[in-house]
Amino acid sequence: SVFSNALNGFVAKLSDDELLRLQKDADVVAIEQDTLVVLQGDQLNPPWGLDRIDQRDVLRDSRYSYNETGAGVSAYIIDTGILPTHSDFGGRVGSGFTAISDSYGSGDCHGHGSHVAGTVGGSTYGVAKAVSLIPVSVLSCAGSGATSGVIRGIDWVIAHHESGVPAVANMSLGGGVSASLNAAVTRGIDDGVVFVVAAGNNNRLACSYSPASTPNAITVGATGSNDARASFSNYGSCVDVFAPGVSILSVGITSSSSTRTMSG
């Protein structure tokens, strides 16, 4: 793969001699070994809703009040894909992109991406109930994928984002620190896309992970219904905000009306 938007770079299998020659090339800024990134989220019960985020007070009022619907905004879900036929999406799922070589395209055979999309923009479970949802599939049915595949997804987002159109990208995934992945996210931000990324589920410093350590991304940690940091959530100076992330009810993929509860 060759990157031309998120990075000026490429993916290649190199011999030791080829690697040495590239390391000595003054035009090469950095070389990284491709690594594995994984989903941020585990299935838990019971669920709780949107009630917490529309008020500062921890005491919930059994209502989710909002002034904006996200209409006219593109939300790129960089994840496992989205089930476009789910009723909660109301036909607002675009064709998107896949970096995964399987028969699902930008559809979802894992469920995490659809759950995230439902949390972002589902009509019942979502925050922005009229946003346009665009699947960017970079993780497999097993919930993992190469860092280079994630960068390919970001590269596609940058290439297809229309200048002046409000857009956000969600990345509920992560791996070890990658300068290349962080640089790709930064390039996307510079292009006008707001990147919201998971702090991670390792109960460690978020600065030790990517894309959580990207300086200008909005890095989000997880809290439970008691407003305390979730036991699994990463923490530290790289975390910009905490939000509900324990036992979240959203879209499932077993049918066009199914639900699923996940944490992360």
Show where each model-derived region lies.
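Short, well-structured alpha-helical segments in soluble
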Residues: G153-S163
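Short gly/ser/thr-rich secondary-structure transition/capping motifs
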Residues: R52-R63, N202-R204, T223, S256-S257
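Active-site glycine-centered loops adjacent to acidic/histidine catalytic or metal-binding residues
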Residues: D79, G200, G264
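Catalytic-core segments of hydrolase enzymes
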Residues: V116, E162-S255
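Autoinhibitory propeptides
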Residues: S1-G49
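A short glycine-threonine-serine/GTX helix/turn-capping micro-motif
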Residues: S257-G264
